[in-house]
Amino acid sequence: MTSVGTTLIVKPANNSGGSDGNIKNNNNNNNNNNNNNNNNNNSNSGNNSNNNSFIDDQVLHTGYLTKQGGRIQNWKIRWFVLKRGTLSYYLSPINWEYTKPRGVIYLTKKTELKEVDHRNRRHCFAVNPNYISENQSIIQQQQNQPILRSSSDSVNNNNNNNNNNNNNNNNNNNNNNNNNNNNNNNNNNNNNNNNNNNNNNNNNNSKLYPNSTRIYLISAQTVFDKSKWIEMIKLAISSDNSQDSKLKRANHQLEKVKDLVFSNRKGSIPTFPSLLNRTIATESLNDLIKVHLSKKRFYFYHDNLTLPALSYIDSESPVNLQEIHHQHLILLQQQKEELNKKLKKIQQQNNIGGGGSGSNIANSANKINNKNNDKINGVGSGEDKNNNKGGGGDNNSQSSSSSVSPTTVSPSVSPLSSSPTKPPIILSKKPLPTPPRNISTSDNGSGTDSPFYNSAITRLPLISTSVGMVGPNGMVNITSMNTTTTTTTTTTTTAPTTTNTNTNIKPLPGIQQNKLQLIQNKDGGGGGGGVLKRTNPLLSTSAPSMAYNQLVANSGIIHKHQPKIVVFHLVRDSFQISNIGGCSFNFEILSPFDPNFTLNFIPSSGTIQKGDSLTVLVELMAYNHIETDIYSTLHIIGGMEFTLFCRIETDPYLPLFLKSCAGSVLPLEKQMKMESFMKKNPTMVKSIQELAHTLILDGRNIIPLHLSNNININNNNNNGGGGSGYNIGGGSNNSIGGSGSNNNSNVNISNGWNIENSNRRNSGGCLNLVGGSGGGGLINNNINNNNNNNNNNNNNNNNNNNNNNNNNNNNNNNNNNNNNNNNNNNNNNNNNGSGLLSSSPLITISNQNTPTPQARVKLSKYILNFQRNQKKNSVGDVESVKIYQLLTDKFLISNSGSADASFQFHFPSRGKKNDLFSLSLVPTNGTVSKGEWFYIKSTLTVFVETEISEMIQLIINQREVHHILITVKCENIHPGNKEIDLEKEVVLHERLGTGATGDIYRGLISQDNLNRHISNQDSSGSNSSGSGSGHNWLIARNPSNDIINKDAIIGSGPQIIVAVKKLHPLADPSPEMIQDFYNEVRVLSMFNHPNVVKYVGGCTKIANWSIVMEYVPGGNLMDVLANPVLVIPYKLVLRMALDIAKGLHYLHSLGILHLDMKSPNLLVSSLSTSAKVNIKVADFNTCINRSRITAGFFNRHTGSGDNNKVEKDSKKGTTLWMAPEVIRGAMYSEKCDVYSFAIIMWEMVTRKLPYSHIAFNCEVEDQVLKGLRPPIPMHCNKNYTDLMEQCWDDDPENRPYFDTIIHSISKMIESNDITEQKAKASFKGLRRTQSNSTLNLLQVQNNNNNSNNNNNNNNNNNNNNSNSNLNNCNNSSPNLGTNSANNDSGVSVLQTCSDIGVGSTGTNSGTSGTNSGFDSPVIVTKDYHLISNLQKLDLHSNDGSDTNGSQIGFKSDINSKKSSLEVHSKHKSKRFSYDGGSSRASINTLNNDSNLPFKFSPPSTPQSSFLQLKKLDKELKSNLESNAGTKHSFIRYKPSFTNVTSAKSKLNLNNNNNN
């Protein structure tokens, strides 16, 4: 006979048929359960492990690892298998169970495990078994314990213990596989076996370990894999595998269960039937009962999950059901003690009740039993609907329970569903198949579709007969027996349990009922107690139906991993109970109580006929994040018990989102946890927030009533003193109502969930307690303890719908209230005898008749990464975001609800991180009307190189919160960009210039600080100074004799002068200014070219924007050209033009357009013709990338009349240098810079500003569009003029590219060098043969330029004027007058003449009109130094000179062997209009873009091909060879500058890199 309260839990056997894990408590001596595994472990007797295969052969962990060899120190990959006590490795995982391992590492208590670092191997750990030390311990134990006695402990409670002990010993020794009834034989076998195998059974170590000192070095693949292996190996080492410890541990756990069952029964919490509170009556065991369960482990799958990413985890459930989880038992014990304390605290209150009976809302036929039968007259008496009179204490408890027929299931409602009730049904006798799982089914349109996905919700379908019945309409109705345990408790006695079958339950609208109802009487209670009803307010008007509505016959696919439970989502599984015995039996399923979840078995009790099967549905819903194991008990009345196991591991993040999205302020730790989840899982942010908001709007985010931790007592005076009562396990605002005479003690038990929201909603957590009749009435306890209807706002109707079941007609089951009961205080005067406890949710629940309008706001995305408009690189990846880049993004906000919604953005980090980024959202607040949608535009600018991951909140109607994640990783403007702390690293001094956006300062930076910002390429010396020394520009700029205090500079080493462009400080810069600064820094950091100004670094801090550049001492080109003291020879002009062309060609090769090319943006590095670099291009704030240029980039025309004016913002550059297409507003191209280069060429020739006679820029633009160009000087070289005219052609297609321009200028420089070489060679010959101090210049024929010599017919007339006093050549310069018969005559550029003899008068060709003589005299000094062999050409202008002629003067310095030429031009040319057309041939190239910035392709046009130019070079070379034999050769000078005045001025070393 089984004793009362004993729970038998036996490990299931591995047999496929028969009773799977059945424990038979019969009177016979059947010991099959002990002998099922005898033959399974014979092969493991020598492996130092226990013979229990179900435990010892359990594989803890497997995987590939790399192991170092023992003899040969090589590394090999092996398949490792970890079991308790052993770590084996195989060649491969294929059939490793049937193959011999390559090696075994025995894990003992002394095995050491640690992480090591081994050479190049990563993720290594070492295993040191310590076999020698373990063997010594074994030998010592064998000496201390010579004989091992088998354990006499047994889990089985059979009548023949001798057989059990014998069989257990046989199992240990593997000697007897037969179940013999002869005890003596078994005992003899046991003794012999124990004596023979004494050493083999000592501490599960049958043999000594090998005498080896080897340390196994193992390497894992990843650091996570290594941590997992170390953890599992430690677990295998720490586990005790001995049989004694197993039996001891099992008995210890059994005692724990017994203690939980029998101890403190009086104070146990009333709840569902479970191991903690059930009372098992004396039963007679029936040996004909045989039960088979389809499964005893449950893996729940979601019924209506809309977030598949949360559904599965890699988690394994415990295998051994016999070993109940120790921590779980401790947790249950702690919960039990905690709840007992709460009950004792409540019981200490004196609740002196008046008369009146209390009954529950279920309208059961129960009369409340006054255990003491004390007739205490109450304040009043009354009766309920069932005529249960209160008062007088004559109320006797009677329970009427319906008889249960065989194979009959009493119908009820699932606590987690709202299915209608049905009459009792008779199950079919045919066994049912296992229900399929994890099959996607479509919805029937009952409001269960996901509001965010068009696809149907994945459900777990069940076959209809598996849940008992199919209704007439084909709908599946899940039924269960509602087992109600009613305990009437006094201070001294405990009444036995009674089972009531409620068949007339009609749940309240929107409230899902629970099964347990408790009626409790307090001392002094007059006739009746209050009513305790535990409800589960999973209120949802659009929640999916919990009953399955589709028949599925196919078998489902079972997921390999443990499914994860999502809070507030129903999960289900099922199993079958089959009666394979000879009689019918009754069963009941007992589930544990836990405040964090609800586990229901449907049906939870019933009768199964012989040969029939019943499918039991298991429903689970979790309310918080938990990770635990649940052990339930299936009790077969008169038979046996089974342990049912399920693993719960919930998602830890959805509860956080439910609280935060509902408006609750999370603790800092949980807030960081939620934000960390959003940052690590950006793809799930949208889904999980939509799921949370759906649960909130549906009212499913309310914590159930039984989640109670804190107790708050509030006393309210109400009319009447009904029966005392309280509610256990309340939710957010639940009252435990006790009643005294005219004094109701209301105790609020809650865990503090969402108190803030409850207060904001006033009566959102309203509880109404109805006391007994007589003095009892309606106790309406709001959160504010206020019965004023004015504070209930919109929730009054909902509370009345849920709680107004007490009408004046005393009808308990009246769900449809005709009276709205707007005044809750009037309900307190009703003498209802029924006790009612109900709850309303925090979120407004719509009335079924007149639903309350709700707003449903949705966002198109919850993550803003600002990469919508980012370009993609060649690989296809999106380019990284740069600092100071204006980033834009947008998202859609819509309202699909029935009411308007107000919204407002909240920036938690605003004010804290303003120096990092600037974020704006437009609009920031407003209203979204129902059915309306629009875009929210967001702009972001990041100021520093960082990774931003910030949260902003969108608040809807001041109660819903949407969290939007902003994640941007900003890199520096360019890899070459260096951030400089301007205040610490640079010392600013005098201002060099000013501009529209900022000022230019001269500063000093130390060499050490500069080296940290300059790359090796910048310091390679390719950019030499103007002195021609070839050293680094940093060294050349070292101010060794500077008067600046060097101690003021932070850093050591020599100090370097730099130029600092500091922008005007602005507190709130506009986006345009930010982009201009960003653009200039970005472009400068990309460049590395000798003709582009060097970029040192930049300071990108707000209000301290600055750019540190190379200091160029010569100033800008415009100031140099305007300085009259500076002498600029023609050779220098060509070299400066070549430098400018190279710099612009480099920009164009990178796809950069300057668009503001002008002389103020060109810095002069040197004026020496021997310098490698003369000009550097600067000022790049208007640069744009060619790839960003589109037709829509510009505003074409405003359409205002005939002028076709263009918007000012669409034009970049300065008017004087602006190309016609830019003025028209056409699309930019490289030809815009080519036009500006032509204007600069004209500036260098004339040393004037263009269009100086026009006052207004608008007039300049009109004239340029009409074809006006600056006048070309008459003395300018033809090739130079042709190139200049080509570059400023009105049609951009006719303008050459810069590679062609570079080639043309290079040829001009080569031609000029050849001319100089000829001049030097000619005058050396004159110096050897001529002894006179003067030389009469003769007319010679010019072979190179015959078209421009018509103006030089009268040059020989001036020979007599060449007599000058050479003795005063150091102080004065002779004037050589040249009379020109033509006003257009001028002095041409240096050109080579043909060879003639000395004294030759030349030849004049009258027919051709060409003067073949030399134009101007050449003076030779006594020491035969040619005056024209000059190194410096000084050009001055004489405005008062005569216009009919020109004077040429020479200054000669004999001592320094240097001479200069002064040209005084009296000719003033008139301006003329130029229509852009030219009859001269232009030079173009077929290749528009040059890939190499320093290798230029020659022109290949038919007009002037490379072969023609090469032919010209051959002719020049032949002329030089023919002139080598002559005695004299002459050159003629054509000065190339006019109108230059002589003045004295100092050298202005200003660096004006501004506009």
Curated annotation (Swiss-Prot):
The record's listing under Gene3D superfamilies reads: Pleckstrin-homology domain (PH domain)/Phosphotyrosine-binding domain (PTB) (2.30.29.30), Transferase(Phosphotransferase) domain 1 (1.10.510.10)
Give TM segment ranges.
none
Give a GO biological-process term: signal transduction
The UniProt regions of compositional bias labelled Low complexity, in chain numbering, are: 14-53, 138-205, 359-378, 395-431, 486-504, 781-832, 1340-1376
GO CC annotations, alphabetized: cytoplasm
UniProt entry tagged with the keyword Protein transport: no
Look up the EC number in the record and give it. Answer: 2.7.11.1
| Residue ranges of the region described as Disordered | 1-54, 138-208, 342-452, 486-508, 781-850, 1012-1031, 1340-1383, 1457-1480
Q: Name one Pfam family in it.
A: PH
InterPro entries per the record? Kinase-like_dom_sf, PH-like_dom_sf, PH_domain, Prot_kinase_dom, Ser-Thr/Tyr_kinase_cat_dom, Ser/Thr_kinase_AS, Ser/Thr_Kinases-Pseudokinases
Q: Where is the composition biased (Polar residues)?
A: 437-452, 833-850
Q: Which residues bind ATP?
A: 992-1000, 1061
Q: Which GO terms describe its molecular function?
A: ATP binding; protein kinase activity; protein serine kinase activity; protein serine/threonine kinase activity
Q: What are the disulphide bonds in this sequence?
A: none
- For the PH domain, which residue ranges apply? 58-238
What does UniProt list as catalytic?
1156
Q: Which domain of life is it from?
A: Eukaryota
Which terms are listed as keywords in the entry? ATP-binding, Kinase, Nucleotide-binding, Serine/threonine-protein kinase, Transferase
Family classification? Belongs to the protein kinase superfamily. TKL Ser/Thr protein kinase family.
In Swiss-Prot or TrEMBL terms, this protein is called Probable serine/threonine-protein kinase DDB_G0276181
Q: Which organism is it from?
A: Dictyostelium discoideum
